[in-house]
Amino acid sequence: MKEIKDFEKIKIKIASPDQIRNWSYGEVKKSETINYRTLRPEKDGLFCERIFGTTKEWECYCGKFKSVRYKGIICDRCNVEVTHFKVRRERMGHIELAAPVAHIWYYKYIPSRIGLLLDITASSLNSILYYEKYVVIEPGDTDLKKMQLLNEDEYIEARERYGMSFNASMGAEAIKSLLENLDLDELSSKLRIQMIDKDDKTDKKLLRRLEIIENFKISGNKPEWMIMEVLPVIPPEIRPMVQLDGGRFATSDLNDLYRRVINRNNRLRKLLLLNAPEIIVRNEKRMLQESVDSLFDNSHKRKVVKGSSSRPLKSLSDALKGKQGRFRQNLLGKRVDYSGRSVIVVGPELKLHQCGLPAKMALELFKPFVIRRLIESEAVFNIKRAKNLIEQEVDEVWQILDLVIKEHPILLNRAPTLHRLGIQAFEPVLVEGKAIKLHPLVCHAYNADFDGDQMAVHVPLTPSAQAESWALMLSTNNLLNPANGHPIVFPSQDIVLGLYYLTMEKKNTVGEGKKFLNFNNVILAINNRSLDYNASIYVKIDGKYKKTTAGRVIFNEALPNGIEFVNKTLSDLELQILISKVYVVHGSSTVIEMLDIIKELGFKYATKFGCTISMSDIIVPDEKKAYIDRANKEIAKIQNDYAKGVITGEERYNNVVSVWLKTNEELTNKMMEILKKDRDGFNVIYMMADSGARGSRNQIRQLAGMRGLMAKTSGDIIELPIISNFKEGLSVIEFFISTNGARKGLADTALKTADAGYLTRRLVDIAQDVVVRIEDCGTINGIKVETVKNGEEILESLKEKAVGSYSIERIKNPITGEIVLDANEEISEAKIELLEKIGIEKLVIRSVLTCEAEHGVCQKCYGRDFSKNKPVNIGEAVGIIAAQSIGQPGTQLTMRTFHIGGVAQAGSEDDKISLKNTFILNGIEGFNVRVENGILFTRKGTLKIINVFYEEKIKNIKEIKVSDSQRVIKGIPLFVNNKGVEILSSYIGYVKLRDDKFLIVSEEQEVSLKAGTKLEIEVGEYVESGKVIGTFDPFAEPIIAEVKGKIKFKDIILGTTLKEEINTETGNVEKRITDNVFESLDPRIFIIDSGGVEIASYVLPGDAYLQVEDGQNINIGDIIAKLSKGSEKTQDITGGLPRVNDLFETRIPKNLTEMAKVSGIVQFKSIQKGKRLINILDEYGVEHKHYIPAGKHLLVRDGDIVKAGDMLCDGRINPHDVLEILGGISLQEFLLAEIQDVYRKQGVSINDKHIGVIIKQMMKKVKIVAVGDTNFVYGQKVDKHTFYEQNRKVIEQGGEPAIASPILIGVTKTSLNIDSFISAASFQETTKVLTDASIAGKIDDLRGLKENVVIGHLIPTGTGMGLYKKIKVSENVNSEV
């Protein structure tokens, strides 16, 4: 027998009638199933033994032959073959239909495939198939046209008029003959000519028709096979019928659907034999068509066929579709044997590689192994006795179980398994009771806690499975998080608290200030109680006395040898840094040893510390009242400004919210300060939060500060905060306001978890076939990486960005010229430090985004595997790792609201600008005007600054060894000071000699400023760090006069473009430009000079508040109008997850901006149809039109110079525009930055390469814009590699290649367009995918993981890769080389 695993590809086609008859073992003629008396299948029925095989093993139906020795004989009485009953799972039957029937997949699904081929609409097709209208097949020499539809009356009239000279009929027969008459080659060339004529405006329908025709041509399917003459009957075991206890039968819905088809078919046969009237026959044919439709797809019909309990019957399509369908329920999600589940409890005594397995559970799981050992040890001689012994649980059984379990790993899994660390291998240790014991340090990877969580246990059976569990899945081999390379096994909670207590320092305690010669003496002193754990002491280390504490000595004494002395108070972050450091320096074995020591110590000293918290530990600052009074005064002032009409309602609201956020922040800082001083830093609440063991600053703020601002149901912030804290107690109204946030948190958590899970599923689906397949793709392209900054603050260093990647270019030391980093060399931590030392801030590295491997990626472009901190192995499933790395935090982020209980969080904006570093202002860019005491930026501007790293007065210098403006790196001699000491540079930068100072400064940097910023410093000024250099209004964007003159309104008409609102609270009149768009009206303000000449014009966007009157005089710098920023909403990942979704689905954002298509000069034109036309004149004098909705706030003015890709108005950027205007690389950078931004705000670190893998998959296809001599169709979307391959062939033959442009496709769409139809079908829209695949005769190369899981092969990654399958063990050891 041929091994089922011997195939490498799967092809899907439409089955021809002959093929169906070929599969069949006989025709099903009756609709009976089982005889109710004998309970045996009826002859020729749906369960007939003659067709489908015997129901009893090795026995025919009548019982004449009963034994395996008659195997293969067909009984002469009952015609049943003597065989195994399992054949009833694989033998098919068929039904010969009395009239042809159309297959619902090909005519009903939109777009209708038959409709496209014949070019008729779906409704016309339906009317033909359901016998409502005739269609002309051959017009003969009449006036009728081919494919013309005739109703009953028209048909009779035509027959009377033309007699039999034309051919018209209805039903599936008519469609079948039309399909038979199609000449696909002729049709294809006709359509291609039409496509070329249409050129740019490709008709989607034309493209679809062409694609379908090409698919039929290539696949060898015949169009008429979409109409069925023979119906296959699937094997009976797949649609079983079983007897229930009460004697009734439960049957699969398919049997009911088949019965209806057979009954109607038999009735139609009889009617045809009887030559019944046409109308009756027609009705019966229509009913047959309907019954076959419901058999194939019942849910897709208007009138669904219902069963006895009026629930729709499950048809063949429904059995494939959805979560409960064949693909996802039975093929991708099988249940496995040798598994069990139980509640987990903590096992602090376990080693990192162990887990506790309940003895009863172990006995059940390892039963076959125990039975084998029992028989081998000759305690029993057959399996039955062995089972009895096991049930009696005799001593021998337990002894054998111990032997069996030794070094047999088991897998532990906790649902939801969000990333690969959700399943890890452990060595089992037998424990009493019924709960699984879990090591406390692996909880983080599983996201497990011990409040009733359950875990599943699986037993790997074969030696190779056990070897893989040991080598790859053991918990000690999974110390690092694959998403970012940070440790994922680290202490938390009690352990952290214990170590924090142990390593803290306390003043005035027993034994303070003593000196000790070695660690042992310290431990002796502690045991004799003459020394306190927290006492500050001196200990001799490496021949020198070092100031430390007794506790730290204990901690260091316990650590493995070779780790340098840790002399600080250990919080959770410090511990993680320590673990990382030890991992890099000493490797994993030392870390594993250290982790278990840390766990022991932590628990031990947490117990000794025995901390408790009481109300007296919660200290409310005495200054609280003063802070709140001050806030109330500020708010009164804001209210007063509002009453005078100085600020708008939105600004007032934003300012009030800002005041409370600031007050809360200050109060919290004060409170933390007091807690820190309380009991010399031993206030337990402070210790818990500071160590990171439990609780956060945010939670303590609610206990001892104030609860703060709360959010309304809408997400807006209520401007009156909850001033009380939990210690003081909340008033009734405060409590009531709190409830909404708390409830919302719980509801959100439930909804968002599903969202994040679905995101992960889509990502896995798009990236599942990305595997590292080759070592080097040989690309010369790479991407630029540099430090990510937000102003002064470094968000992500060059090290985080580039470490573990390979360099594209060779980098030399700018001073010595020696090669520091060669091309194609891995960038290690040491190399990065070297590069930073010589001042390299940008690198071009190889990236998955630019990898040119045909399938998957190559080792060099992927770089380092973060879970191992080594270069990635060939065969690593990097696509799935990427999907998990992005999806897993998504699920975590959704849980955020849950813990803080709905307290509003929004960044409070300051209205002052100051920079952290000392700097020199080199220059300014952007429109600005001089006003008294400063410079006012009328639009967005930029400061060009150079930071000052180092300064020394020249009078203190004896000799300068460098020249002005020279670039220096660390370690270069700068000067000799007056004391004769040579000073070396500890910075990278440029020398600047200024007045009486010697400076080292940075390269020029840019700081962007908002419109309306008033700058209070001059160009060239030397500015100390922290000095306020300017102010701006954070809650409104002003439109500012740049010239002096008189105001003149244009198209500002009260009631049309201008709305006057009387504010009910203040009685002031607010003038607001409406955001309704009028065809011809374009509200503007002109400034005219004394001669009435227009010298400036300002376009007013919708919702702008006017600050001037018509005819009023205006000075430079006065505000003409202002735009309020929308009210503050709370920033939560609720904003984050949908944003990530939109980016991955490449949805066009709602509030779109328009980007400049080219670089050039802006020219304002008229408003047409509610859109403003803006032309950009490029350098060749060509005008490029841009249409912008009229109410939008413009970011450019007439005559401005813009660069391609600049935003012309405010709004969100559309990724498709980025691709079109700036190209593929810019789009990749844009998507990467946007997605990272969402995660970074939540404090989640994901390496760029994971997001890169997904973006690479989204940009896999190109769109054909010129066909050349290839077989492509204009406007068709094809895979990049297919495109290059076809072009290569055409060029070799001297033809003209096709031209294509890159496109971006969202993840869902990409998953459905994936090459593998099995993978796409198991994702979504199963029936549609299979319909298209069958027409195209698609071949699945079984390249991805999913398709191999579905058909039961090993997945082609890791050890299952083709590369490793061919490895043979050689017998001959001493063979000649």
From Swiss-Prot:
What this protein needs as a cofactor is: Mg(2+); Zn(2+)
GO MF annotations in UniProt: DNA binding; DNA-directed RNA polymerase activity; magnesium ion binding; zinc ion binding
The protein's annotated catalytic reaction(s) are: RNA(n) + a ribonucleoside 5'-triphosphate = RNA(n+1) + diphosphate
The alphabetized list of GO BP terms reads:
DNA-templated transcription
Pfam family for this entry, one: RNA_pol_Rpb1_4
Q: What is the protein name for this chain? A: DNA-directed RNA polymerase subunit beta'
Binding-site residues, Zn(2+) 2: 777, 851, 858, 861
**Family per UniProt?**
Belongs to the RNA polymerase beta' chain family.
Q: What is this enzyme's class at the first EC digit?
A: transferase
Annotated residues for binding of Mg(2+): 449, 451, 453
* E.C. number: 2.7.7.6
Cofactor binding notes:
Binds 1 Mg(2+) ion per subunit.
Q: List keywords of the entry alphabetically.
A: DNA-directed RNA polymerase, Magnesium, Metal-binding, Nucleotidyltransferase, Transcription, Transferase, Zinc
Cystine pairs: none
Gene Ontology terms: cellular component: DNA-directed RNA polymerase complex
What does the function comment of this entry state? DNA-dependent RNA polymerase catalyzes the transcription of DNA into RNA using the four ribonucleoside triphosphates as substrates.
Q: Could you tell me which PANTHER family the record lists for this protein?
A: DNA-DIRECTED RNA POLYMERASE, DNA-DIRECTED RNA POLYMERASE SUBUNIT BETA
Residues binding Zn(2+) 1 are: 60, 62, 75, 78
Binding partners and assembly: The RNAP catalytic core consists of 2 alpha, 1 beta, 1 beta' and 1 omega subunit. When a sigma factor is associated with the core the holoenzyme is formed, which can initiate transcription.
